[in-house]
Structure formats: C-alpha cells, structure tokens
Amino acid sequence: MKENFNISKLKNGLTILTYNMPYVHSVAINLIAKVGARYENEEEEGISHFLEHMAFKGTKTRTAQQIAEEFDSIGGYFNAYTGYENTVYYVRVLSENCHKALNILADIIQNSIFADEEISKEYQIIMQEIAHHHDNPDDLIYETFYNTVYKDQPLGKSILGTAKTLVKFTQEHFLNFIGKHYNAENLYLSIAGNIEHNKIVIIAEELFASLKQGVTSSFIPAKYIGGKGFIHKELEQTSLVLGFECTSYINLEKLYQTYLLSIIFGGGVSSRLFQSIREKLGLAYVVGSYNSAYFDSGVFTIYASTAHEKLELLYSEIKNEIIKITETVSTEELMRAKIQLRSNLQMAQEQNSYKSEEIGKNYSVFGKYILPEEIIEIITNIKADDIINTANKIFSGTTALAIIGPNDLNGF
C-alpha cells in the first residue's frame, strides 16, 4: 500500500526510504550503493566485491570481532553482496534493535580502515572463492557465456575479479573507491518493518552526517555481441548455455512480457523445455530458461546438461522448441505463467526483507516506488500475441553459445 511508504532526503542528499509493516516484529535494513562490477575500470576489476568483503573487517572504533559480537548481541543477521550494478549491505533485527543496527552499519560505511593484514587475509579468501567458482561447471559456463556476450566490457567480466588485479589492492585503493562512489547521492537507505519513518530520519541524520554529497556514479553502456565460447573440462556431462539479447529492465511492459515468455518456455516443470527435453525425450535432468536484465541490456538464456554423445540432439531439440514458441502460445500456458508470476510477487510482499530491497532498488533505478498493483496490472494486460512477438524478436537476434565438456567442440 502506498500509504505505508515514505521517503525523505537528508541534508547531505542521502535518500531514506521506509515501508511500515506494523504486523511484524522485525526490521529489514538495506543500504544500497549504486556501484558494482560494471562501474570498474580494468585496474579496478573485482574491487567492488573485495570492498564488500572488507566492510566487516574493522572501523576506527570497532575491530572485526567487535562488529561480529555486536551484531550477535542484538540477534541480528547481517551480510552483503555485489552485483554488476549495485552493492547491497543488509541487516535484519528485531524492531527494538533497529537503532543499534543502524549505528554499526553507518560506522562500517563511513569509517572502515582497510588494515593491511585484513586485506591480505581477505585476498586469500577471495582467491579460494575464485578457485571454488572455477571448479563449479555451472559457474564456469556462465562466466564464459558473459565473457562471450559482452566481450572486453565490464558487464562481461567476473564480479570476483582476477588474481592479477586483486593482489594489487591496498588501503589507498579502497579509500579512493569509497570516496568516489560511496557518497550520499549514490547511496539509498531502505528499511521495511515495524518502524516509524520520522524516527528513522532523525536517527539517520545523526548517524550518516559525515557522508559527503558527491554525485551519482556512471558506467560505460553495454553492447551485446554474441558469439561462441568453449571450455574443455573432463566432466561426466556436457553443459550448454544458449543466449539471445533481450530487453533491459527500464521498459517494464517488455520486461514482464519476457518474464512470462521465460516461464512458459523453460521456467518450471510444466514448461515446454522441461516437458519436451526431460519428460518426453529424456535428454537432460536439468533444463530451463531465464532472463537477466540490466539498465541498458538484457540476456535471455537457455541452460541444459546432457550426455556428451547427445549434445547435438539436445541442441537440435531446443532449436525446435524455439521455432514452436515463435508460432503459438496457448491461453492456458499464458494463464499458468501469469498466476506463477503474480503469486511470487504477491507472496513476496509479506516479507520485510523483500520489501526493503524492493523499495530501495526501485528508487535507485526509477527514482520512484513502483507499486505492486502497477506490476500486476502490466502482467494482467499481456496477451498471447505479446508473448509470440517477444519470442520472435528475441530469437531472431544474434546467438550466443557457451559449452563446457570433455570433447573437442570447436566444430560445433
């Protein structure tokens, strides 16, 4: 409900967003920095993610252990994650501990010291994360896919960075990156739960007073390229990711048409890919489709794994299903997909962790809060012809293909 949503801007420009949910006992806090991996230059690759790791490693007044103990002492859950377009720090605590949680979070964002010994330790941890990532075929194939689709662009680089760049980062690098991107205009504090907006504003005015004004960060526009990427790896199965360019998240009508297409095509056990590739032909245990959207680009992906000798047949059957969905979509299929999408959206509204992230990301991207009712209306108005037209536009575009397996795939 719109009346539960409030927004204020502090004197320094920090945006405060709250959504009151009086029936819950907790609050979910998100501090969203509008900076991620695609904002990095070549020398900075991986610094957004590294910085997120360093956020809980000590401030001017708290050691890493004290930060952990203070969060535990208020029964809080805290973590952070880095994407291509933002970095999110989130906390969930009982409403009575909201002030204390904000105090710690504000200290982390404004006063982290990035001690050399902590940088060295975290470097080793991230290198282990990268090694784990490269040992996982699913992670590796998607990394290869994005390297191919957005070749030589920040959106095609790994969020984790590389040993070549990570090993060079010092306290100075982190402080410079913070100074450049972690300013009041580039941060959004969003809170959902049993809270009062005016009290949150007063608390935030006090705790985030030292944030400098600054400007919103910018990035180089993405250019979808397509192409093929192959990785030779001794595995029990061969996996493929087939992709096409699709809409960004700025056009909501096109975005939700693409979501519905993905659900119908490969989004669940009743989807066409699942029923054809797995249930009817037995070609794959895992098969599905998904669309990823960014500010100025998007990718529709189809993923499957199969026995090495069945790869060509699998690929052929996927292409057959692509042809079919560009021709017909039934009323029943569309209705099932709409119910799935609406159900997921409406059930998520009951979770304050979802609401906190939703209002923060909405405002950081669109400059406004998009009501769930607006989204539901968009979904409701989509017709079968819209899905067919979307499928034709997407699948007539330049193909991108990534394959990982033990065989020689260069002739594929």
From Swiss-Prot:
Gene Ontology molecular functions: metal ion binding; metalloendopeptidase activity
Cofactor(s) annotated in UniProt: Zn(2+)
Keywords for this protein: Hydrolase, Metal-binding, Metalloprotease, Protease, Zinc
Stretches that traverse the bilayer: none
Note on cofactor: Divalent metal cations. Binds Zn(2+).
Active-site residues annotated for this sequence: E52
EC code(s) of this entry: 3.4.24.-
Binding site for Zn(2+): H49, H53, E129
Domain of life where this protein originates: Bacteria
Pfam family, one: Peptidase_M16_C
GO terms for biological process, alphabetical: proteolysis
Disulfide bonds: none
Keyword Metal-binding among record annotations: yes
Similarity-based family: Belongs to the peptidase M16 family.
This protein's name: Uncharacterized zinc protease RT0210
Species per Swiss-Prot/TrEMBL record: Rickettsia typhi (strain ATCC VR-144 / Wilmington)
